[in-house]
Amino acid sequence: MESESESGAAADTPPLETLSFHGDEEIIEVVELDPGPPDPDDLAQEMEDVDFEEEEEEEGNEEGWVLEPQEGVVGSMEGPDDSEVTFALHSASVFCVSLDPKTNTLAVTGGEDDKAFVWRLSDGELLFECAGHKDSVTCAGFSHDSTLVATGDMSGLLKVWQVDTKEEVWSFEAGDLEWMEWHPRAPVLLAGTADGNTWMWKVPNGDCKTFQGPNCPATCGRVLPDGKRAVVGYEDGTIRIWDLKQGSPIHVLKGTEGHQGPLTCVAANQDGSLILTGSVDCQAKLVSATTGKVVGVFRPETVASQPSLGEGEESESNSVESLGFCSVMPLAAVGYLDGTLAIYDLATQTLRHQCQHQSGIVQLLWEAGTAVVYTCSLDGIVRLWDARTGRLLTDYRGHTAEILDFALSKDASLVVTTSGDHKAKVFCVQRPDR
C-alpha cells in the first residue's frame, strides 16, 4: 500500500493570525536564556536537600515477577509490516511505552490488561513482568540512570522495580493517576492526580512532597531541564510553574493567560526558558518560564476548520494532542486531533508548514539534533517529516489499529510503538540523508 499524499503548506504562506502577542513583547527579547545545563551532581544534591514529608509505609503487593514464554514474541504478521520485532504478550490495548535512557536497549510497556512488562528491544525477549496492578497501566518509565522502572495504573497505584534484580522496591497508592514522570537527574518520581495534587517522592525510601493545585485534575506535567522546576497543567485551564525545592508556585497563569479548557500536554525547550502548553481549546500557548508571561498564542489554521453545519448538527471536536520544540532550529510543532501537524517558526512568529494526516495525531516527537519530527496517528502509521520543507520523508506501517504511544531512541535508529491491536512494535529507521 502506497502512502497517501500528504503535503505541507509552502513556506511563503502568509501568516494567518496564527500568533498573537501581549503588548509589545517579542519572543526573542522576552526570554533570557540560561547559560547552560546545571551539573548533574549539583542537581542530585539539591534533590537530596528537598524537605520531603515522611509518609507512613503501606503494605505493598508482594507478588514477584513472572517469566512469560517466548511464544509471546512475534516475528511478523499478515499484511504489510515494516517492523523488525513485535512484542505480543499484552492481551488488550497497549497504552504506554518508554525506553531506558542509558542504553536504549530495554522497553517498558503498560496496557489495558492491567499489566506492564520490561522487555528487550533487540529480540522482544521478556525480562520481567511488573506484577500487581489492578487497573489499566497508563504510565511507565525508567529513571534517569536506567536502574529503576516505574509503572502507574489509572487507580493511582504506583510501583517501582529495580531493573537488575527484577524486584519491587517501592509502592504507593495516590489518587486517580493523570501523568507520571521521573526527575531528569535524581531518583525522584513525580505524578499528577485527579484531585489536583502533584506528588514528588524519593525512591525507594518514599519521602513525599505534595504540590496542591486547584480543585480539579492535574492533567499533564513536565519537569523542566534544570531539574529545579516543573510545569503542571490543570483541567480548569490554569498553568502553574512550581519550585520543586520550596514546594511553592513561581508563576500561576489563569483566566485569559491560561487556557479556556483542560490542558492536554506541555513541553519545554532545551534550556527550559520556553514552555509550550496545549489544550482542548485548540490553542497552544508559548510561555516564558522566566517571567511566567504568555509571549505567543498559536491557533489552528483555517484549513483545519469544519464547514458550516445545518441546524441540529454538531461540529467535530478538535484539540491540541501533542507539541514540542526543535533542538537545532527555532521551530515548534503542534499536533491536532483533526490530523493537522503545524510547524511554527518562532523567529519570524509565523506558520511555516501545515502537514495534513488522514486521521488524528496522537503524539509527536522531534529527533534530537535535526529538524525531523515524527508523528503517530489513529491510522496506525508512524510518519517522519522534514520540518524545514514540510515534506513527508517516509512512513512505517504494521499495526492493525490506532497507535496510542511511541518512543524514539537517542540516536533515532529505533521507533517503538504501542497500539490498540494489543501489540508493541520496534521499527528500524533508515534514512539516506544521514
From Swiss-Prot:
Q: Where are the transmembrane segments?
A: none
What would be one Gene Ontology cellular-component term for the protein?
cytosol
**Record's keyword annotation contains Glycoprotein:** no
Quote the InterPro entries the UniProt record gives: WD40/YVTN_repeat-like_dom_sf, WD40_repeat_CS, WD40_repeat_dom_sf, WD40_rpt, WD_repeat_multifunction
Family matches, as CDD domains: WD40
SUPFAM superfamilies to which the protein is assigned, alphabetical? WD40 repeat-like
Q: Where are the WD repeats?
A: 89-129, 132-171, 173-212, 214-254, 258-299, 315-354, 356-395, 398-433
Q: This chain belongs to which protein, by name? A: Angio-associated migratory cell protein
Q: Which Pfam families match?
A: WD40 (PF00400)
Q: In which tissues is it expressed?
A: Expressed in metastatic melanoma, liver, skin, kidney, heart, lung, lymph node, skeletal muscle and brain, and also in A2058 melanoma cells and activated T-cells (at protein level). Expressed in blood vessels. Strongly expressed in endothelial cells, cytotrophoblasts, and poorly differentiated. colon adenocarcinoma cells found in lymphatics.
Q: Extract the GO molecular function terms from the UniProt entry.
A: heparin binding
Compositional bias ranges of the Acidic residues kind: 39-62
Phylogenetic classification of the source organism = Eukaryota, Metazoa, Chordata, Craniata, Vertebrata
Print the keywords alphabetically: Angiogenesis, Cell membrane, Cytoplasm, Developmental protein, Differentiation, Membrane, Phosphoprotein, Repeat, WD repeat
